Amino acid sequence: MTKFQLITKGLVKDNPTFVLILGMCPTLATTTSAINGLSMGLATLFVLVLSNIAISAIAPAVPDKVHIPVYIVVIATFVTVLQFLMQAYTPGMYATLGLFIPLIVVNCIVLGRAEAFANKNGVIDSALDGLGVGLGFTLSLTVIGLIREILGSGSAFGFKFLPGDGILAFVMAPGAFLVLGYLMVLFNKFLKKQ
């Protein structure tokens, strides 16, 4: 597999949201706006790339019996660094995303890539895999958030462009499920045509 294919695989064929249906908790809860979706996606991307690099580097030295707890400690370390950075430089976004930032530690996307890819491959390939999956997750959350924001409040990335208030249901839980469901259908229909 080429380096380019490693990245595009996580974007399309193994998209964590629309194909693998992973990370549903942050997907449904944080995508009330495009900015929130983008921010959560970038936070997860940061942790994915760095944890994949670290886990790939230490994997040969980690005994099989304790590899999952070790991976969780590595992931938790990067999440803690992310929390400190967000608190220092983007306190408003940190407050908005709240509990979902520390929950990246147990996000099945991050742990799944560590277990399925990073511990069996080299550092560069693991970084590219994390980048591809992270970009796929970021793109998914941003698109879901953008659609929900447009339909729910008539704005995009915080800029109001439609008159009125929009359809309130789209910024609430039912809207999250509707938008996610329709996008999953469209995405998978697109994949089957290829």
Regions found by a protein language model. Name each.
Residues 5, 125-194:
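C-terminal transmembrane helix-loop-helix hairpin of multi-pass membrane proteins
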Residues 62-75, 96-102, 126-129:
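Cytoplasmic-side transmembrane-helix entry/capping segments in multi-pass membrane proteins
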Residues 81-96:
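Transmembrane alpha-helix boundary signature
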Residues 51-64, 111-121, 186-192:
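C-terminal ends of transmembrane helices
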Residues 22-28, 44-49, 76-83, 105-111, ...:
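Hydrophobic core segments of alpha-helical transmembrane domains in multi-pass membrane transport
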Residues 7-18:
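N-terminal membrane topogenic signal
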